[in-house]
UniProtKB/Swiss-Prot annotation:
Summary of the function given for this chain in its UniProt record: Autophagy factor required for autophagosome formation. Stabilizes ATG13, protecting it from proteasomal degradation.
Keyword Zinc-finger attached: no
Protein name: Autophagy-related protein 101
Organism: Bos taurus (Bovine)
Assigned GO CC terms: Atg1/ULK1 kinase complex; phagophore assembly site
Lineage of the species this protein comes from: Eukaryota, Metazoa, Chordata, Craniata, Vertebrata
Length: 218
């Protein structure tokens, strides 16, 4: 199986990290979640509805849509908060990345553990810029909103392609494809990881700083 890989880059101020990452992760999971499966008998099932809600950002001029699942939101906020704190405490240039990997399980014979086979990975490279004035922060608030809108549109375009998705499982195999542990939504199996690094390059950070300077010069 070929694993699809998508890479996004964002440049943000420190206080915007959490909102920007939640916007991206929630958007991807909105398109990679279904309602809960309700099996009547093997091979026959119904799918519940997936509720959505708008989220207005506090530090970015942006509104995104997420699945209205508090459990899913808490799970994402926990790992994004850890990423934010790691960036803040890195003492470096504020460079890091988060990866959202979708996978399915392949059962293995005892005593071996199940094999996790990735089929789609989203990587978001994050560059944190330091701003000196409130005027710069206001400009960054607007510019990041514009750039984030472009990223969300890109995500939706990718999701609309007719590419591989795991086939709908039978009742006995549903846990090999979906995370059934949430009460109100059923995302494809996923895991999130992050790393802090000083080797991601500075092209996006430089672009954001140039955008701010150009706007100030007007």
């Amino acid at each position: 199986m070929n694993c699809r890989s998508e890479v996004l880059e964002v440049s943000v101020e420190g206080r915007q990290v959490e909102e920007a990452m939640l916007a991206v992760l929630h958007t991807v999971l909105l398109h990679r979640s279904t309602g809960k499966f309700h099996y009547k008998k093997e091979g026959t099932y119904s799918i519940g509805t997936v509720g959505t809600q708008d989220v207005d950002c506090d530090f970015i001029d942006f509104t995104y849509v997420r699945v209205s699942s508090e459990e899913l939101d808490r799970a994402l906020r926990k790992v994004v908060g850890e990423f934010r704190d790691a960036l803040r405490n890195s003492g470096g240039d504020g460079l890091g990345q988060m990866s959202l990997e979708f996978y399915q399980k392949k059962k293995s014979r005892w005593p071996f553990s199940d094999e996790c086979i990735p089929w789609e990975v989203w990587t978001v490279k994050v560059h944190v810029v330091a701003l000196a004035t409130e005027q710069e922060r206001q400009i960054c608030r607007e510019k990041v909103g514009e750039k984030l809108c472009e990223k969300i549109i890109n995500i939706v375009e990718v999701m609309n392609r007719h590419e591989y998705l795991p086939k709908m499982p039978t009742q006995s195999e549903v846990d090999n494809v979906f995370d059934t542990g949430l009460r109100d939504v059923q995302p494809y199996l996923y895991k999130i990881s992050f790393q802090i690094t000083d080797a991601l390059g500075s092209s996006v950070t430089t672009t954001m700083r140039r955008l701010i300077k150009d706007t100030l010069a007007l």
